[in-house]
Amino acid sequence: MKIALDAMGGDYAPIETVKGALEAIKESNISVVLVGKEEEIKKILQDYHYNESKIEIVHAEEVIEMHEHPAFAVKEKEDSSIVKAIKLLKEKKVDGVVSAGNTGAVMSSALLYLGRIRGIKRPAISTLIPTLTQIPSIILDIGANVDCKKEYLEQFALMGKVYMEEIFNVKNPKIALLNIGEEEGKGNQLVQETYTLLKNNPLFNFIGNVEGKDLFKGTANVIVCDGFVGNVAIKTAEGVAETLFDLLSSEIKSSLWSIILGLLLKPKFKNVKKKLDYSEFGGAPLLGVDGTVIISHGRSKAKAIKNALKVAEKMVKLEVNKKILEGLNKITDRGD
């Protein structure tokens, strides 16, 4: 199996992306196609011993930067690492794509060249969030669709359900709507209409609404919302987590006794940090496009890239997109 990696995507590319690819080929049976500036990639590879038969390079002269407008950049920079990686998937030269680059550009490129799974109205950007249980939850959408219809959210629920069943082996995952209250009548018109739709769908183990405070409790395995709400929720959570760790670090250094206490608690802090670390999950899928595309955090280092490549491998092996289509057909058969 071959996975294309956008070697130029992310804050620490190409050094960390290349290192992540090398770690991945050691731990799995995949081959990695590094897409990016060939000379830069070769220079990094010179410092490592690796199985050369499992690494290929496809040169891409251009890079879509994080600040660039996604749709314009994809059309203007056809020789960019993101676009060329997606084109390799379209041409069936690879089985999946991983990128830590401009999320919007990855999505725009995937829609332009791969299209949607038949019947999917809108793809969704998802992310995995740590919980108090041993299994993360998936939240979608987190930015692809600011304005949604109830049918879009129903499909997001389906895609999240299939992903949790196949990738994390969660049987009959609990599905919830992110809302301003737990009661059925809460929320705007979209949320209330979607509530009724999910409640009456026999395919779903729908548990109702969850509030923002419940996101990390593991109350639901799949959390559904529109892209505006999802993006605000995730960015807020990231900011709170970073601020808390900064405050703790500052307090620990404030006196000798707190330094000693901090040293004693260091292993516990490490465990907590590991549970909150996005690199453990690697990346999250762009669900609904007709191909396996994994989007990693822009700050991904080698470990996150390695794990993202493994997620892509698993998605391909388990035929997640095929199962999404099968689930979609069941919804359609109900006459919705």
From Swiss-Prot:
Catalyzes the reversible formation of acyl-phosphate (acyl-PO(4)) from acyl-[acyl-carrier-protein] (acyl-ACP). This enzyme utilizes acyl-ACP as fatty acyl donor, but not acyl-CoA. Homodimer. Probably interacts with PlsY. GO terms for biological process: fatty acid biosynthetic process; phospholipid biosynthetic process. Its main location: cytoplasm. The keyword Nucleotide-binding does not apply. It is an enzyme of class 2 (transferase). Its EC number is 2.3.1.274. It comes from the Bacteria. Gene3D superfamilies: Isopropylmalate Dehydrogenase. One of its GO terms (molecular function) is phosphate:acyl-[acyl carrier protein] acyltransferase activity. Belongs to the PlsX family. Keywords: Cytoplasm, Lipid biosynthesis, Lipid metabolism, Phospholipid biosynthesis, Phospholipid metabolism, Transferase. Pfam families: FA_synthesis. InterPro entries: FA_synthesis, Phospholipid_synth_PlsX-like. Pathway: Lipid metabolism; phospholipid metabolism. GO terms for cellular component: cytoplasm. It catalyses: a fatty acyl-[ACP] + phosphate = an acyl phosphate + holo-[ACP]. PANTHER family: FATTY ACID/PHOSPHOLIPID SYNTHESIS PROTEIN PLSX (PTHR30100), PHOSPHATE ACYLTRANSFERASE (PTHR30100:SF1). This is Phosphate acyltransferase. It is found in: Cytoplasm. HAMAP family: PlsX.
